[in-house]
Regions:
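Generic beta-strand/beta-sheet core signal
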Residues: 78-80, 118-122, 146-148, 166-168, ...
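Short, basic, glycine/proline-bearing loop/turn elements
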Residues: 89, 139, 156
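Active-site-proximal region of nucleotide-activated glycan assembly enzymes
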Residues: 1-55
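Conserved catalytic-core segment of nucleotide-activated headgroup transferases in glycan assembly
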Residues: 37-134
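A donor-sugar binding/catalytic signature common to diverse glycosyltransferases
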Residues: 1, 149-191
């Protein structure tokens, strides 16, 4: 019955209800959440938690993109699985433009920035129109694509970037945990 209304906003609301109604003391809830996020962000292999997919296994600690420019305002943009959520009405309402269109708009409207688009490691070996359209964004000035199989350290990228942009993925809340400014575009489970 809980999952009867399966929209993302409902899931976010249910998570908040569970959090608020739990008998666990608030300080313990925060301590548990902080511990989980700290392990997720700081355990580069993420092998200590069987519930976390091993997306960082190949990443080299503190490796940054070769194109990194200290003299620019650097934006780390983390792509979500558009093909999984793209047809959900709630997602369409909260994000009327695709991630590709959004990146195009940002890069054309704001000069003197570098955008580092991290394609999710889960999308490696996916020959999909969406992934290919993301790769094509490298033709734009100031847009740098980090391929799924790249050894660039995603969490270090978060730490050194000036701004994090997320399309509803957990990277948004992870970056907020690192005290980074975060712009989340579209709906998310952590609203």
């Amino acid at each position: 019955r809980i999952w009867e209304d399966k929209d993302i906003g409902n899931v976010a609301d249910l998570l908040k209800i569970f959090f608020d109604n739990s008998d666990t003391p608030l300080s313990e809830k925060y301590k548990t959440g902080e511990s989980w996020l700290s392990r997720r962000v700081h355990d580069s292999s993420q092998v200590s938690d069987v519930l976390i997919p091993k997306f960082t296994e190949r990443q080299v600690e503190k490796k940054i993109p070769n194109a990194w420019r200290e003299d620019q305002f650097n934006v780390a943009l983390f792509i979500s699985y558009e093909y999984e959520l793209g047809d959900i009405d709630e997602v369409k309402r909260s994000m009327p433009h695709s991630q590709v269109e959004t990146i195009n708009v940002i890069s054309s409207c704001i000069s003197n920035i570098e955008i580092y688009v991290r394609i999710h490691p889960h999308l490696e070996n996916v020959d999909h129109e969406f992934v290919n359209s993301i790769k094509e964004l490298s033709a734009l000035d100031g847009v740098n694509i980090i391929l799924p199989e790249s050894t660039v350290d995603s969490y270090y990228l978060m730490e050194i970037a000036d701004l994090i942009i997320s399309f509803g993925s957990t990277t948004g809340v992870e970056a907020a945990f690192l005290s980074k400014p975060v712009l989340t575009i579209g709906c998310s489970y952590y609203e």
